[in-house]
Swiss-Prot record:
The gene is apcC. PROSITE patterns: CPCD_LIKE. One of its GO terms (biological process) is photosynthesis. GO terms for cellular component: phycobilisome; plasma membrane-derived thylakoid membrane. This is Phycobilisome 7.8 kDa linker polypeptide, allophycocyanin-associated, core. Pfam families: CpcD. InterPro entries: Allophyco_linker, Allophyco_linker_chain, CpcD-like_dom. The keyword Thylakoid applies. Belongs to the phycobilisome linker protein family. Gene3D superfamilies: Allophycocyanin linker chain (domain). It is a peripheral membrane protein. Rod linker protein, associated with allophycocyanin. Linker polypeptides determine the state of aggregation and the location of the disk-shaped phycobiliprotein units within the phycobilisome and modulate their spectroscopic properties in order to mediate a directed and optimal energy transfer. It is found in: Cellular thylakoid membrane.
């Protein structure tokens, strides 16, 4: 069982804009493996996004995540 982070982020979407001044933001939630967290964090920030919430998640509810 691998440790996962459940992240909620906000990234500006340039593909959905109708005019130059309008900027549409896209919210998304995804599970990211513990090992890939830093890479994912860099990707979101380079795209001009903000990480709103980070939670530790496991595959099953009630499973010990191994934090002590």
């Amino acid at each position: 069982m691998s440790r996962l982070f459940k992240i909620t982020a906000l990234v500006p979407s340039l593909s959905r804009t109708r005019t130059q001044r309008e900027l549409q933001n896209t919210y998304f939630t995804k599970l990211v493996p513990y090992e890939n967290w830093f890479r994912e964090q860099q990707r979101i920030q380079k795209a001009g996004g903000k990480i709103i919430k980070v939670e530790l998640a496991t595959g099953k509810q009630g499973t010990n995540a191994g934090l002590q």
